[in-house]
Curated annotation (Swiss-Prot):
A GO term for molecular function: translation initiation factor activity
NCBIfam families membership: IF-2 (TIGR00487), small_GTP (TIGR00231)
Pfam families in the record: EF-G_D2, GTP_EFTU, IF-2, IF2_N
Extent of Low complexity compositional bias: 322-338
Protein name listed in UniProt: Translation initiation factor IF-2
Organism per entry: Streptococcus pyogenes serotype M49 (strain NZ131)
Biased composition (Basic residues): 339-348
Annotated region described as G2, given as residue ranges: 488-492
Region (G5): 599-601
Source lineage: Bacteria, Bacillati, Bacillota, Bacilli, Lactobacillales
Length: 953
């Protein structure tokens, strides 16, 4: 909205700038001078107000200005008797206060009406200031006029008044004429004959009538005046409060300055006393020193004068300084040598016994009581710390029999002996290793006792193969996890969280196969409670005993869940008796272990099992501090083609947030994203919460600890340092040939080796597979793991296999198209598996030479899922298009997502449009269903293959 300046408004309406400024202030606008600007709406408001106020000027032919023309002019003439004063009052009025004018006019009208009565009412109405509703008042007054002749009387009265006023000034004659013409016009228009037209006639009363409007105007004027007084009182009270507050602030400031000045004066007095003491001490030393210096200068002066003078041929002696002497020494003994010094003419340079300037001495500093040192500190660093000269410390070391310079490093024993000589208690500084994240788990001061809260228990489910661990967890989570596991066994740790009775419980599902011993050990190390699953029909098995040993080693309580009690051959009592032999005694028998008989398949006694878990957790008093930086353990790690390194973490203390700088094992990074066990993104993870994170530089090892650092710089430094240490440790563990192991090395050359390269989907599977293959014992043959890593089989793996004559074993991963092509070219064998004991059996049979029939996998074709359709009571149908080869009805299929095999099974149905077909060829579309798998997604790759038996050469 545009703005206008006040002087422009004044020029537009023909008023002075001062009047416009005062009226703008009266309206409540924030203006200061004629140069101030106001909004367009406020400018229109000011112009309209002035136009209303100046309306009598426009109709000058009809009315007379009440205050500026008629009344003030008469008053001025009576008081001064001067025509010049009257003109001045009319032509140049003072600044107007509209509110005060309205109040004064209201009071004046009320007083005038009471004094003159009803006969002068019309004259006051015409002579007074026209209010906004004067027109309505005139109309109401016209109704009270009884006869048309009454208008004639009023007309004569107007003429008589005009004739009385006109001799005063020439302008007043013009006003009278206008009044008469206005009255005649009203008479002609019939404005005063309303009562006659209505046919009513009221008798004219001589007694004065009560003017209620005048009373109301007077009352309103009094109310306005009272409001003005109250506003002014409030304004003054506010100003007084502000003044008192400012005065209080000034007093507080002066008090603070006064206290500061007093403190400074005390300090100055103390410093002055110290300086006086030092001056007295120095004066005694200076006086003795100056006496000795003067005595030496008097003895040396005659020789110096002879050097500075020479004799001319006339025998006249002149003073001359030896400026050309390049060997002159400029020191204290020759301090009078000054090139710019001017001497008096004809006089020899003589020594003046002036007192030398006082030599500033080093201030005395007290020795510290304690000295914290580090190994390898230099003499200069020690001198700076204890505020002594390095030369003094070098001298002390020399007296102690140690030859050292100020830049030489000292060992801890020498530093302690030196501090003993000074009388200082020496302490070795304990340096905190920034790269050591294990200290967060061991340091009790890391947690804040006042912030300790109860946390959810971490429960690990252990047991033998196919005893129902994943089925139990599946029942708890109400999902079908077991159907997605190849071979019906769990391949790697899954971490899940459920809620029971308002409390959360975190479950870790560890594999039960013998190859996954290290994974079970890791699960036991981070758990709070162990649920030992034992099948009621099988009893105690080897992995059951191993799980018992892991739990006892970790010192965690054990809850025994006897599963499969719904089977006909179930015998829970036999299981209790067998477990008692290994120290697992039921509370019914006087032991400490809780036993619960369940059926995970039919959801029997599951609630009782969860109640037992919460009861044991309450007894254990599991606590955590969610306010500190997060620390915890890596449950699993894998390499994703699109996201990079993905690690499943279990937060044990603190709260993990997105964008936290983190060190995980020997790598570091920043948490870019966190996903919980339900696949939802979260911004934070509290204690006992499992999450998967991305953002790490490399894939960590399962079982590594992690810690959150204060900033990314510290995390980077710690991660790089840990990586260097791990590499150095690996190099140190490399065995070199010596005389002691020379015979063993030569003997090992006679043993044939089978070189393998292992690639798996997760780190835990890599470790388990490598450990299982190395443990295979066949006489004369051993397995050598050349390389093991997480991720898809790539070209570098094929190149390494060719160079080392190795076999590539892929576990739940697939080779890239380039790697497959290179393997065919270089004749490198790639074995792909999804069940770990199948790999072990195959390698073992190959080592023993018992592979009679050899089955070779033949790829029939590949297809891409373009659309999925979910049909109730049937499953998921995948609409696909063949991009290579063909897909047959009797072929096996693999579902590949991001180069990782997520399912391997048989086709349940194959259709081309609505017809069942035996095969779908290249570039054709069709629909398929896979047995026991409904998690098809768009862009999944379907690989069709068959197993062909080949004759071994």
């Amino acid at each position: 909205m545009s703005k206008k300046r006040l002087h422009e408004i004044a020029k537009e309406i023909g008023k002075s700038s001062k009047e416009v400024v005062e009226y703008a202030k009266y309206l409540g606008l924030d203006v200061k001078s004629h140069a101030s600007s106001v909004e367009e709406a406020d400018a229109k408001k000011i112009i309209s107000s002035f136009s209303k106020a100046s309306k009598p000027d426009v109709t000058a032919s009809q009315t007379v200005k009440p205050k500026e023309v008629a009344q003030p002019s008469v008053t001025v003439v009576k008081e001064t008797g001067s025509e010049h004063v009257e003109k001045t009052q009319v032509s140049k009025p003072k600044s107007r206060n509209f509110k005060a004018e309205r109040e004064a006019r209201a009071k004046e009208q009320a007083a005038r009406k009471q004094a003159n009565g009803s006969s002068h009412r019309s004259q006051e109405r015409r002579g007074g200031y026209r209010q906004p509703n004067n027109h309505q008042t005139n109309e109401q007054g016209n109704k009270r006029i009884t006869h048309r002749s009454q208008g004639d009387t009023n007309d004569k009265r107007i003429e008589r008044k005009a004739s009385n006023v006109s001799p005063r000034h020439d302008n007043h004659q013009l006003v009278g004429d206008r009044n008469r013409s206005f009255a005649k016009e009203n008479h002609k228009n019939g404005r005063f004959t309303n009562q006659k037209k209505q046919g009513r006639q009221e008798p004219q009363s001589k007694s004065p009538k009560i003017d209620f409007k005048a009373r109301a105007a007077a009352l309103k004027a009094e109310q306005n005046a009272e409001y003005s007084r109250q506003s002014e009182t409030r304004f003054r009270a506010q100003q007084e409060a502000k003044r008192l507050a400012e005065l209080a602030r000034q007093e507080a400031k002066e008090a603070a300055l006064k206290a500061q000045a007093e403190e400074m004066s005390h300090r100055e007095a103390a410093l002055k006393s110290i300086e006086e003491a030092e001056t007295k001490l120095k004066s005694s030393n200076i006086s003795a020193k100056s006496t000795a210096d003067n005595r030496r200068k008097k003895q040396a002066r005659p020789e110096k004068n002879r050097e500075l003078t020479h004799h001319s041929q006339e025998g006249q002696k002149k003073n001359k300084k030896s400026w050309n002497s390049q060997n002159q020494v400029r020191n204290q003994k020759n301090s009078n040598w000054n090139k710019n010094k001017k001497t008096k003419k004809g006089k020899n340079v003589k020594n003046t016994n002036t007192a030398p300037k006082p030599v500033t001495e080093r201030k005395f500093h007290e020795l510290p009581k304690e000295f914290e040192y580090t190994e390898g500190m230099t003499v200069a660093e020690i001198a700076k710390r204890i505020k002594r000269e390095p030369a003094e410390i070098v001298k002390k070391l020399f007296m102690m029999g140690v030859m050292a310079t100020q830049n030489q490093s000292l060992d801890g024993d020498t530093i302690e002996l030196l501090m003993v000589d000074y009388g200082i208690e020496a302490k070795a500084k304990v340096e905190v290793d920034n790269a050591d994240i294990e200290r967060f788990f061991e340091d009790e001061n890391y947690l804040n006792p006042e912030n300790i809260v109860e946390r959810a228990p971490v429960v690990t489910i252990m047991g033998h193969v196919d005893h129902g661990k994943t089925t139990l967890l599946d029942t708890l989570r109400n999902s079908r996890v077991a159907t997605g596991e190849a071979g019906g066994i769990t391949q790697h740790i899954g971490a899940y969280q459920i809620e029971e009775a308002g409390k959360k419980i975190t479950f870790l599902d560890t594999p039960g196969h013998a190859a996954f011993t290290s994974m079970r050990a890791r699960g036991a190390s981070v758990t709070d409670i162990t649920i030992l699953i034992v099948a009621a029909d099988d009893g105690v098995m080897p992995q059951t005993i191993e799980a018992i040993n892991h739990s006892k080693a970790a010192g965690v309580p054990i809850i025994v869940a006897i599963n499969k009690i719904d089977k006909p051959g179930a015998n829970p009592e036999r299981v209790i008796a067998e477990l008692a032999e290994y120290g697992i005694i039921s509370t019914a028998w006087g032991g400490e272990c809780e036993f619960v008989e369940i059926s995970a398949k039919f959801n029997k006694n599951i609630d009782e099992l969860l109640e037992t878990v919460l009861l044991v957790a309450e007894v254990e008093e599991l606590k955590a501090d969610p306010t500190v930086r997060a620390i915890g353990t890596v449950i699993e790690a894998r390499l994703d083609k699109g996201k990079g390194a993905i690690a499943t973490l279990l937060v044990q203390q603190g709260t993990l947030h997105v964008q936290d700088p983190i060190v995980v094992g020997n790598t570091f990074g920043r948490v870019r994203a966190m996903v919980n066990d339900l696949g939802r993104r979260v911004k934070s993870a509290e204690p006992s919460t499992p999450v998967s994170i991305t953002g790490l530089n490399e894939t960590p090892m399962a079982g590594d600890h992690f810690a959150v650092y204060a900033d990314e710089k510290a995390a980077r430094a710690a991660g790089e340092e840990r990586s260097k240490r791990a590499l150095l440790k690996q190099r140190q563990n490399t065995q070199r040939v010596s005389l002691d192991n020379l015979f063993d090395t030569l003997k090992a050359g006679e043993i044939k080796t089978v070189n393998v390269i292992i690639k798996a989907d997760v780190q835990g599977s890599v470790e388990a597979l490598a450990a299982s293959l190395v443990k295979i014992e066949v006489e004369g043959v051993r397995v050598n793991v050349v390389h093991s890593a997480v991720g898809a089989i790539n070209e570098s793996d094929v190149t390494l296999a060719e160079a080392s004559n190795a076999v590539i074993i892929g576990f739940n991963v697939r080779p890239t198209p380039q790697a497959r092509q290179q393997a065919d070219t270089d004749d490198v064998e790639i074995r792909l598996h999804s069940i770990i004991y199948k790999v072990i059996e195959e390698v073992e049979e190959a080592m023993k030479g018992k592979l009679d029939p050899v089955y070779q996998e033949k790829i029939l074709g590949e297809a891409i899922i373009r659309e999925t359709f979910k049909v109730s009571k049937v499953g998921t149908i995948g609409g696909f298009m063949v991009i290579n080869g063909k897909v047959t009805r009797d072929s096996s299929v693999r579902v590949i997502r991001d180069s990782v095999v997520i399912f391997d099974g048989k086709l349940a149905s194959l259709k081309h449009y609505k017809d069942d077909v035996k095969e779908v060829g290249n570039a054709q579309e069709g629909g398929l269903m896979i047995e026991n798998f409904n998690d098809l997604k768009v862009d999944d790759t379907i690989e069709a293959y068959i197993m062909e038996e080949i004759v071994r050469k």
